[in-house]
Structure formats: C-alpha cells, structure tokens
Design a protein with these regions (language model features):
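Select transmembrane alpha-helical segments in multipass membrane proteins
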Residues: 6-17, 42, 80-93, 126-130, ...
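Membrane-interface loop-to-helix entry segments
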Residues: 139-169, 344-355, 374-383
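Hydrophobic transmembrane alpha-helices that form the core helical bundles
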Residues: 32, 82-116, 293-310
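Hydrophobic alpha-helical segments and their helix-loop junctions in multi-pass secondary transporters
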Residues: 95, 99, 159-184, 202-203, ...
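Extracellular/periplasmic helix-exit of transmembrane alpha-helices
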Residues: 240-268
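A generic transmembrane alpha-helix motif of multi-pass inner-membrane proteins
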Residues: 172, 181, 370-439
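Membrane-water interface regions at transmembrane-helix termini and the short interhelical loops
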Residues: 65-73, 131-154, 218-221, 330-342, ...
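Hydrophobic, membrane-embedded alpha-helices of multi-pass small-molecule transporters
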Residues: 12-22, 166-175, 184-249, 281-293, ...
C-alpha cells in the first residue's frame, strides 16, 4: 500500500503544530533574552533553540517511538510516577503557569502601553483579565469554529507583523548590539538554554504529538512507518519556523538598547512597535497577540478539561474548566514580571527531569524496559533540579541559602545549569545494578 501525504497536507500539518507551540511565552522571551545578551545574542539564541526547539522535537519523537503513547513514555519509571508526571505537566501548561501567562501577556501588550505613569495597573488588569478569561470559559465550554478561524487568521497576521518588525530592524536597526549582561558575558549559550525552559514548549510537546498523530491518521495514513515519518516531518518544519521567528525576535531585543531597559519582553516589543510604526503599529501587534493568546488559552483550557474528565470519572468537564479559568484569572493578576519570576524556579525543578526522561527513552532498546534504570536516572536528575529550583526561588525573594548554594556548586557542570547530568548517569548505573540483582 503506497501511502503518501500531499505537500499541502504536510504544510497544513506543520503550520498547525507551529500554531500550537507559538503562544505567549514564545513572543516575550526571545526579545528579553536578546536585550540582555547583546553582542552574544547568537550564542544565547543557540542555547534557547536547543531547549525550546530541539527538546520539543525530541519529545515528539519520544512519544512517537513509545507506541504513540504519553503514558508509555512517562510510565517507564513506574505507572504511578507516569501518572503523576503527566498531571504535573497539565497543571504547569494549564492553570499554574501557561494559561495565566496568556492573560498577563495580553494585558501587557494591549493595555499597559496606554496607561499613564501614575496609573495603578491592577484595577485595569483585573477588569481586562476578567473579560479575557470569561471569553476563554465560554469558548472552551462551547467549542466553536470561531476558535479555529481566529487561529488560522490571527496566527498569519501575527507572523507577518513579526517579520515586518524584524525586516525593519535589520534594514534600519534602532541601535547597535548592546553589551552582554551578567552570565551572558561568559556562558551565553547555557544561559539561553535555561531561558528556553520558560516558554514551556517541551512540556506540551508530548500532548501536541498526540494531536499531530491523530491528524496524520485522519488524512488516511495507516502504516506505522509513515505515521512516524509524517509526524516527524511536521515537527521538523514547525521547529525550523520557530527557530527563524526566535532569531528575529532576539535580534530585535538585542538592538533595542536606545529605547531603554524593560522588565519583560512584552514591554520591549510594544516599545519597539511604537518606535517603528507609531501607536497604530503598536495597537495592531497588541491585538494580534491578544487573539493568539486567547486561542492558546482556549486550547490549553480545553486540553486540561478533557484530560482530567477522561481520567477522573467524578470530575465533570464543565466544572474543571471553571476551576481552571478562575485559578488562571487570579494568578494572571500578580503581574507578568512577577509571574515570570515565580515560573522559572518551578521549571528549573521540572525541566531536567523531563530532559532525562526524553533522552533516556531513546535508549530503551538497550535498557530493555528495566524500570529501575529509568527510576535511577530520574531520581538522580531530581536530586539536583529540585534544590536548584529552590535556590532560584529563594534568590527571588531575597532568602539567604548560601550553604545550599555552596554545596550545589560542588556538583560537576552545575555552573552551566547541567548539574543534573552526572547524578542522572550515576542513578542510571545504580538502577542497572539493582535490575541485575532483582533478576
């Protein structure tokens, strides 16, 4: 049987996956990173792309080769761990971090630029996010073609706006590349790698992979090798698109020095848009971002509602999305900068474990499904990632944890944000020994 997908079908599939990945965080983190990286923006961008393009692509592959099952991939270290980790991922890309961020970014891009310096933004934020999340609830409770239409129309508009800003920045840059700040002076690649965590695409990649696989099968592709082939091609093309957009946004941030310093990427992009195209340009970009964020929020809310209602019989879909929307509304009003400062420590705890899980999955042929090996790898990575996240959280709130920091600095590669690697390898070796003894 000669199964073949047309180019237009593959392009549509790739654009769909790109749109799934391209949310609020993808807009604000690259320019903010570029602003701090300055002349080292290339190295920082490479690190960012490694964790926010490369790792999601690996995660898609890991799910595809794990019998196209998220449960299989996550459950290799144990069924209970697998269930716990999947729930944690849904909470992180749902009401804890990603959904609230869509409201915060929308407010930052659409409303904040028009507020006076003496205006209290909280009142306006509460009103705006109340309207935003009410819309999210009704569109999630009543799935409609409006969401698909908005996604198909607004994503291209947003991309066109980004490319126009990027082209203008290249032809007529606002200023020269700035000077690197802090760790961007010495370890720009590894600093960019950690910044890539914040977009959270790798967390969602496994879920998105299942959506792509469903669409591939809906296009009449049935053979296993062809499902793998077209899913991976869609992932590759989407990844290439993300890398190009990140490069544009990072360059814009790196050359925006004359406009001043900004506390987050949303403020920076608004200022750049206003500088290049005036208030109208800033408003057009803001509205495009608003609808992109709205579409993302609806998709994530729906995903959370479907997962928890399917896996927990006593939970009703409508009750879940109400809880998700209300919690997201409250969290979104802490402010974008504050929300980001809380997000990073949490991701520092989770991402190394996810990376260990994804990478180790490619060695299943040699591990032969031995659960103790996977458990050892994940425990080893968590022994460093959790203290690392706690250290970052304490630093955010000015809590002195010098003793813990001194101990962590003794771990190989810790200063490069790769302190989890050696403990994960040691844990895997110990797990292998345990599996041999048990056998």
């Amino acid at each position: 049987m000669n199964e073949k997908m047309s180019f237009s079908q593959l392009l549509a599939l790739s654009l769909m996956l790109f749109a799934l990945f391209f949310g609020a965080g993808n807009m604000i983190f690259p320019p903010a990173m570029g602003q701090l990286a300055g002349t080292n923006v290339g190295a920082a961008l490479a690190g960012f792309i490694f964790t926010d393009v490369g790792l999601p692509l690996l995660a898609i592959a890991a799910v595809v080769f794990a019998n196209r099952s998220l449960d299989t991939m996550a459950g290799r270290a144990g069924e209970k761990f697998g269930r716990f980790f999947i729930i944690l991922i849904y909470l992180l890309i749902g009401p804890l971090f990603a959904i609230p961020r869509t409201g915060s970014v929308s407010f930052e891009m659409v409303v904040t630029p028009f507020l006076g310096a003496d205006t209290n933004p909280l009142i306006f934020s509460v009103i705006f996010t109340a309207i935003f999340f009410t819309a999210v609830y009704f569109l999630s409770a009543n799935p409609s073609r409006i969401v698909a239409i908005v996604g198909k129309v607004l994503t291209p508009v947003l991309l066109i706006a980004i490319f126009i800003i990027g082209l203008t920045a290249v032809i007529n840059p606002i200023g020269p590349l700035g000077e690197p700040v802090g760790d961007y002076n010495t370890i720009a690649f590894f600093k960019g790698m950690v910044e890539g965590y914040a977009a959270m695409d790798a967390l969602a990649a496994g879920i998105f992979a299942l959506i792509v696989i469903q669409n591939v099968e809906a296009m009449g592709i049935r053979q296993e090798k062809n499902i793998i082939k077209y899913t991976m091609l869609a992932g590759l093309f989407a990844a290439m698109g993300l890398a190009v957009v990140y490069g544009i946004l990072a360059f814009v941030g790196a050359t925006a020095g004359p406009l001043g310093e900004f506390t987050n990427g949303g403020q920076l992009l608004s200022a750049v848009s206003k500088h290049m195209f005036g208030t109208a340009g800033m408003l057009i970009l803001g509205v495009a971002v608003l609808f992109a964020c709205l579409t993302t929020a609806i998709g994530l809310t729906t995903a959370c509602g479907e997962y928890f209602s399917d896996h927990f019989a006593k939970l009703e879909y409508n009750h879940i999305i109400i809880a998700v929307v209300l919690f997201s509304f409250v969290v979104s009003n802490v402010g974008l900068t504050q929300l980001l400062s809380i997000t990073v420590p949490g991701l520092l705890m989770v991402y190394p474990v996810l990376m260990a899980l994804v990478i180790s999955g490619f060695f299943d042929k040699w591990f032969k499904g031995r659960q103790p090996i996977y458990a050892g790898i994940l425990i080893g990575s968590a022994l460093i990632s959790i203290p690392n996240g706690l250290e970052a959280l304490c630093a955010t709130y000015g809590i002195d944890v010098t003793a813990m920091s001194n101990i962590l600095q003794m771990v190989p590669l810790y200063n490069l944000s790769l302190g989890w690697v050696v403990p994960a390898i040691i844990g895997g070796i110990l797990g292998y020994i345990v599996s041999i003894v048990k056998k």
